[in-house]
Amino acid sequence: PEQLERKIEALFGKRWGQVESKMKILYGGINSKSVTERLTEPSGAMGAIQRIMANDVSCRHVTADFALEPAKRRLFPHVEKDVVPGSDPTADAKILKAIVHLHEYLLDSRENIDHPEVERTFQLFATVVAEAKKRKGIDKRDTYHCGRIDGKRVDDPHYTLRGWRTVVTYLLRQPEFLYE
C-alpha cells in the first residue's frame, strides 16, 4: 500500500490518501498488531481497490491538469482539451503524441506512435468521445464530481475531458502501473 501511495504522489503531485488510511489491510498491508504479514498474491479486494483508485485518481487530476499552462502539466503537456479525434490529421497526431507521453509517464513504457498499445488507447479515447457525442442529453460541461476548477464546472463541449479521464483510468489499471 505504501508503495502505491508513493508512486501516485510522485506522478500526480499528491497522494491518493485512501490506501494507507482506509484500505491498508485490504490492500495487503500490515498494522503490526493483528496483521503482521503482507499478502504476497493479489486478492479480489485488492482488485476492487485498484479500480476505485484508478477512477478516483483520474477524476481528481485530469481536469485539473488541463487547467494549468501546458509547460506545468504532468499529464497533458502536448495537447489541449479542444483537440478532437478524427477532426483532422494534425489533431490525431497531437492526441497520439499525448498518448505516447501518458504511456511513458504512467507506465514507463517507451512506445512509438504506431505501436498497437498506443493505437488501442487512441481507439478507446476516440470511442468515448464519439459515443458521448451521439447520445442526447449529455451535459456539455464536465461532471460535478470530477470537473470542477475553483468550484465551477468546466465546459467539455467535445467530451474530451471525459475521454482523457477514461484513458488515464485505463492506464492506471494496467499491471505495468500496479505491479512494477
Task: Locate predicted features.
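Composition-driven recognition of low-complexity segments enriched
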Residues: 1-180
